[in-house]
Swiss-Prot record:
Top-level taxon of the source organism: Bacteria
Keyword Iron among record annotations: no
Summary of the function given for this chain in its UniProt record: Required for accurate and efficient protein synthesis under certain stress conditions. May act as a fidelity factor of the translation reaction, by catalyzing a one-codon backward translocation of tRNAs on improperly translocated ribosomes. Back-translocation proceeds from a post-translocation (POST) complex to a pre-translocation (PRE) complex, thus giving elongation factor G a second chance to translocate the tRNAs correctly. Binds to ribosomes in a GTP-dependent manner.
NCBIfam families in UniProt: lepA, small_GTP
Alphabetized SUPFAM superfamilies for the sequence: EF-G C-terminal domain-like, P-loop containing nucleoside triphosphate hydrolases
Keyword flag Membrane: yes
InterPro entries: EF-4 (IPR006297), EFG_III/V (IPR035647), EFG_V-like (IPR000640), EFTu-like_2 (IPR004161), G_TR_CS (IPR031157), LepA_C_sf (IPR038363), LepA_CTD (IPR013842), LepA_IV (IPR035654)
Similarity section: Belongs to the TRAFAC class translation factor GTPase superfamily. Classic translation factor GTPase family. LepA subfamily.
Domain tr-type G stretches: 2-184
Protein name, UniProt field: Elongation factor 4
Gene: lepA
């Protein structure tokens, strides 16, 4: 056991985590040169296209150190985006140490900080690594100072490497073996294994990634899931080198995969403890804290026949993504679908793309909303995650919106722009600290503004230099209203949105204008209105298409023309009473962009 090292690689987006993982795999000979490809651990197509890591991946490698010993390295490549920080915290729970990778050109960024604090809270050994030293813009001395100044860990002898060229990567491994402690645990005690992650394989059923904390797991053992009490047979187990390799046993301290022929998706939840049925452990390992979704949106299949397969797809995805929340929802405009909870807008986009790609579904998404706390006049407190669930205005005593605490790191030059943006988003400044030419800003901004497009706008006002980390702080009373959209005097529930009263006029007007361009013209006038309660705040009309009934007259008497026009008018009137308006899918997507600057 003393030769096992479990560690994660944590860093801000694009600081070179996945490339460093590639080099480590190459040096330890996990894959032959022929099988080696860039970002070998980003196995999803989506990850490769966007160049980001979404799922944490684990690998077991053997490394022969300079002291002549051979060490077994179990390492986990983690995502850098703020939306996937729960993936990072789950990976860290399986480790004794973490490599904090910092780009020697960019320096410390917000996510570097957030991930590092997560690691420190879990009492992990953090080893700083300065990456990309081959860049002309690299300034390792300055960045080492920044790490000490902002993060507060000793970085005087931080390892310098370039993952792209491979310089210094062996030093990283040597330092790792030296500084990260071996796993603690009792190899002879009762089995306790923590489920770090799981996914669904069409042939094998549920595959789980486990970290053995105590005891040993052997092939063919009877294994019990502690939360449900069900027992399964350990059919196959093994490690990733990144290829799946079968083993006969997983020893104490190792990280590996396990197949128990679990067909039920909820059979082995992530964060649960596995133990042996013969000699069970007394208590379960502390799991992970449940992540609360921050953004909710309705997802509806375009054709209602897909509802069943959509439900199965969500089930399989939620197994792989523990933070995805969903419940059935029906809408008069869109039929049956699900209300889903996500951690942020990127997470929502990724889930939607994965559903469309991996499960061949066509989906319509409604506007994302956050959870509001509503105190009714009957003094009840309810939580509302969809505009259609909001009680009528006169039943609401107080409406509270979630406030996010946003930590931003940015160069001084962009401070003015960023502060202007935060004020525009109804933010309140709580802290500002200067570190060299970097500024650390803390603002409290309503969550609804953060999830809409704050991140994109922050990046564009600071030319990509500012970085952001946010978390939920509290609920705060606020003057929010629901804006309804009426088409021909009928409310369309899927188009409603909740917004602050100050912005409601402009949002309503903008929405109505957008809808006017998107709804195809019919044979009769279509009135589109935005309303708060019964008060109409904006209106526009999609003009009717009409045939020129006078074309056949050629001159002729005025009364003849009047008769024809009158007849047409009556026909249109009848049509309007019975006519239905078909809303195109673009109309629903239009709301997603309301309130965003059309840059």
């Amino acid at each position: 056991m003393k030769n096992i090292r479990n560690f994660s690689i944590i860093a801000h987006i694009d600081h070179g985590k996945s490339t460093l993982s590639d080099r480590i795999i190459q040096i330890c000979g996990g894959l032959s040169d022929r099988e080696m490809e860039a970002q070998v651990l980003d196995s999803m197509d989506l990850e490769r296209e966007r160049g980001i890591t979404i799922k944490a991946q684990s690998v077991t490698l053997d490394f022969k150190a300079s002291d002549g010993e051979t060490y077994q390295l179990n390492f986990i490549d983690t995502p850098g985006h703020v939306d996937f920080s729960y993936e990072v915290s789950r990976s860290l729970a399986a480790c004794e140490g973490a490599l904090l990778v910092v780009d020697a050109g960019q320096g410390v960024e917000a996510q570097t900080l957030a991930n590092c604090y997560t690691a420190m809270e879990m009492d992990l050994e953090v080893v700083p690594v300065l990456n990309k030293i081959d860049l002309p813009a690299a300034d390792p001395e300055r960045v080492a100072e920044e790490i000490e100044d902002i993060v507060g860990i000793d970085a005087t002898d931080a390892v310098r490497c370039s993952a792209k060229t491979g310089v210094g990567v062996t030093d990283v491994l040597e330092r790792l073996v030296r500084d990260i402690p071996p796993p603690q645990g009792d190899p002879d005690g009762p089995l306790q294994a923590l489920i770090i992650d799981s996914w669904f394989d069409n042939y094998l059923g549920v595959v789980s990634l486990v970290r053995i904390k105590n005891g040993t797991m052997r092939k063919g053992d009877k294994i019990k899931v502690m939360s449900t009490g069900q027992t399964y047979n350990a059919d196959r187990l093994g490690i990733f080198t990144p290829k799946q390799v079968d083993r006969t046993e997983l020893k104490c301290g190792e990280v590996g995969w396990l197949v128990c022929a679990i067909k039920d998706i909820l059979g082995a939840p992530v964060g649960d403890t596995l133990t042996s049925a013969r000699n069970p452990a007394e208590k379960a390992l502390p799991g992970f804290k449940k992540v609360k979704p921050q953004v909710y949106a309705g997802l509806f299949p375009v054709s209602s026949d897909d509802y069943e397969s959509f439900r199965d797809a969500l089930g399989k995805l939620s197994l792989n993504d523990a933070s995805l929340f969903y419940e059935p929802e029906s809408s008069s405009a869109l039929g049956f679908g699900f209300r889903c909870g996500f951690l942020g807008l990127l997470h929502m986009e990724i889930i939607q793309e994965r559903l469309e790609r991996e499960y061949d579904l066509d989906l319509i998404t409604t506007a994302p909303t956050v959870v509001y706390e509503v105190e009714t006049t009957a003094k009840e407190t309810i939580y509302v995650d969809s505009p259609s669930k909001l009680p009528p205005l006169n039943n609401i005593y107080e409406l509270r919106e979630p406030i996010a605490e946003c930590h931003m790191l940015l160069p001084q030059a962009y401070l003015g722009n960023v502060i202007t943006l935060c004020i525009e988003k109804r933010g309140v400044q709580t802290n500002m600290v200067y570190h060299g030419n970097q500024v650390a800003l803390t603002y409290e901004i309503p969550m609804a503004e953060v999830v809409l497009d704050f991140f994109d706008r922050l990046k564009s006002t600071s030319r990509g230099y500012a970085s952001l980390d946010y978390n939920f702080k509290r609920f705060q009373a606020s003057d929010m209203v629901r804006v309804d959209v009426l088409i021909n005097n009928e409310r369309v529930d899927a188009l409603a949105l909740i917004t602050h009263r100050d912005n409601s006029q402009s949002r309503g007007r903008e929405l109505v204008e957008k809808m006017k361009d998107l709804i195809p013209r019919q044979q009769f006038d279509i009135a589109i209105q935005a309303a708060i309660g019964t008060h109409i705040i904006a209106r526009s009309t999609v003009k009717q298409l009409r045939k020129n009934v006078l074309a056949k007259c050629y001159g002729g008497d005025i009364s003849r023309k009047k008769k024809l026009l009158q007849k047409q008018k009556e026909g249109k009137k009848r049509m309007k009473q019975i006519g239905n308006v078909e809303l195109p899918q673009e109309a629903f997507l239009a709301i997603l962009h309301v309130g965003k600057d059309n840059k």
